[in-house]
C-alpha cells in the first residue's frame, strides 16, 4: 500500500475497530473461496460497541483491505471514517442497520449463493423455505442463540422477500420478514442471496455457514429422491 492509501486509517488504525476491519477482510476472502460471493457482490459488517465497520461497494471481495472500509456510528448514523479512495458505501447499509436495530446483532453477512437462487424457484409459491431432518439444524439458532437452537426434527422456516432493482429498496420488506419470523437468523432475497446475522461475528459466520450448508444438502437430497 502506498503512502497515499496509508495516510488516513483513522479509527481503523488500532484497537477493536481495527480487529473488526481485519476480520472483515479475512471473511470476505473466505466467502469468495466458498463461492458465496463473486466479484464485488455481497457484503459484510461487524459491530464494535456503537460503531460498525462495513465493506464498501466496488471492491472485489478477495482483494478487500483495511483501507477500503467504512466506519459508521450506530447512534448518529454518520460515517466516522470514509476511504481515501472515495469508494461508494455499500448498498446493503440500510439493511445492515435494520438488522442491528431489530435483532441487536453484532454482525451481518450478505451472500450471493447459487443455492439461494435455486431455492427461490423451488419455493416460488411459498413465503418461506422450510426443511426438517437435517443434523445441521442443531447449529442454527432460533433467532438468537439465547433462545436456543433448532433440533434436527424441527421444521425450520426461513422467509423469502422479493428482489428489487436497488439493494436499499429491500429495507422495508426485510424489516417485515424479521418481525414476522422471530425464530429466523436469516432472510432469503429471491433470485439474489441471503442476509444472515448473529450475536457475535463468530456466531454470524457459523450461522451463515450452517444455513448455506442446509441449502446445499436440501438441494442435493432432492436430486437423489426418486420422482413419485
Swiss-Prot record:
Residue positions binding substrate: 92
Swiss-Prot/TrEMBL GO biological process terms: L-methionine salvage from methylthioadenosine
Recorded catalytic reaction(s): these are: 5-(methylsulfanyl)-D-ribulose 1-phosphate = 5-methylsulfanyl-2,3-dioxopentyl phosphate + H2O
Active-site residues are 135
Cofactor(s) listed in the protein's UniProt record: Zn(2+)
Q: How is the cofactor bound?
A: Binds 1 zinc ion per subunit.
Q: What is its EC number?
A: 4.2.1.109
Q: Does the entry feature the keyword rRNA processing, yes or no?
A: no
Recorded metabolic or biological pathway in which this protein acts: Amino-acid biosynthesis; L-methionine biosynthesis via salvage pathway; L-methionine from S-methyl-5-thio-alpha-D-ribose 1-phosphate: step 2/6
Per UniProt, which keywords does this protein have? Amino-acid biosynthesis, Cytoplasm, Lyase, Metal-binding, Methionine biosynthesis, Nucleus, Zinc
**GO molecular function terms here?**
methylthioribulose 1-phosphate dehydratase activity; zinc ion binding
The question of whether Protease is a record keyword is answered with no
Q: Name one GO cellular component term.
A: nucleus
Major localisation: cytoplasm
- Residues involved in Zn(2+) binding: 110, 112, 192
Any Pfam family from its record, for instance, is Aldolase_II
Q: List the disulfide bonds.
A: none
Compartments annotated for it: namely: Cytoplasm; Nucleus
Top-level EC class as recorded in UniProt: lyase
Function (record text): Catalyzes the dehydration of methylthioribulose-1-phosphate (MTRu-1-P) into 2,3-diketo-5-methylthiopentyl-1-phosphate (DK-MTP-1-P).
> What's this protein's name?
Methylthioribulose-1-phosphate dehydratase
The organism named in the record is Schizosaccharomyces pombe (strain 972 / ATCC 24843)
Q: What is the lineage of its organism?
A: Eukaryota, Fungi, Dikarya, Ascomycota, Taphrinomycotina
Q: Which gene encodes it?
A: mde1
Amino acid at each position: 500500500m502506498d503512502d497515499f492509501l496509508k495516510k488516513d486509517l483513522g479509527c481503523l488504525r488500532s484497537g477493536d475497530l481495527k480487529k473488526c476491519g481485519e476480520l472483515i477482510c479475512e471473511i470476505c476472502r473466505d466467502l469468495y473461496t466458498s463461492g458465496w460471493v463473486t466479484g464485488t457482490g455481497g457484503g459484510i459488517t461487524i459491530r464494535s460497541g456503537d460503531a460498525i465497520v462495513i465493506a464498501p461497494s466496488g471492491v472485489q471481495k478477495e482483494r478487500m483491505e483495511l483501507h477500503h472500509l467504512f466506519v459508521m456510528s450506530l447512534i448518529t448514523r454518520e460515517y466516522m471514517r470514509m476511504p481515501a479512495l472515495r469508494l461508494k458505501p455499500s448498498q446493503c447499509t440500510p439493511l445492515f442497520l435494520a438488522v442491528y436495530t431489530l435483532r441487536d446483532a453484532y454482525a451481518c453477512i450478505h451472500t450471493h449463493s447459487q443455492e439461494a437462487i435455486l431455492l427461490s424457484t423451488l419455493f416460488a409459491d411459498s413465503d418461506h423455505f422450510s426443511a426438517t431432518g437435517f443434523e445441521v439444524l442443531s447449529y442454527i439458532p432460533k433467532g438468537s442463540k439465547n433462545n436456543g437452537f433448532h433440533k434436527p426434527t424441527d421444521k425450520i422456516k426461513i422467509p423469502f422477500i422479493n428482489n428489487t432493482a436497488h439493494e436499499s429498496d429491500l429495507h422495508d420488506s426485510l424489516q417485515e420478514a424479521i418481525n414476522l419470523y422471530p425464530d429466523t437468523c436469516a432472510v432469503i432475497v429471491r433470485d439474489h442471496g441471503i442476509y444472515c446475522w448473529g450475536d457475535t461475528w463468530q456466531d454470524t459466520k457459523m450461522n451463515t455457514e450452517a444455513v448455506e450448508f442446509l441449502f446445499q444438502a436440501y438441494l442435493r437430497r432432492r436430486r437423489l429422491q426418486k420422482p413419485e
